[in-house]
Amino acid sequence: MITSVQILSLLDQGLVDYSQVDALQRSLHEEVLAGGEDTLIVSQFTPTWTAGRHTKPQDIPSTTIPVIRTDRAGSATWHGPGQLVVYPVVRLKEPVDLVQWIRAVEASVIDTVREAWGLPVHR
């Protein structure tokens, strides 16, 4: 169970570069593994496609938007203006159903945005 978490909001920087946030996430991951504080990164990206390990060429439309290959599972994902992205960089202290945990975090973020700002957010 996570008891406290640092929130690192990049929203005041406007749209940020995916690669920079990816590097930050990896650095924070190393810190957390070494006993550092759990962190939520909150950001919004410049238009970018990320291509997971299962991405096929036809998964990404022909476009001038940059495509960044990632080591994550899955296929293509678009990131861009109007999309709030939250990355939890945490040490899970006990075995958990990871998909269920991610869905719970996602639901909490959606509920918080809806309640705090009254925005019509959805998954």
Q: PLM ranges: what are they?
A:
Residues 1-123:
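N-terminal lobe of the biotin/lipoate ligase/transferase fold
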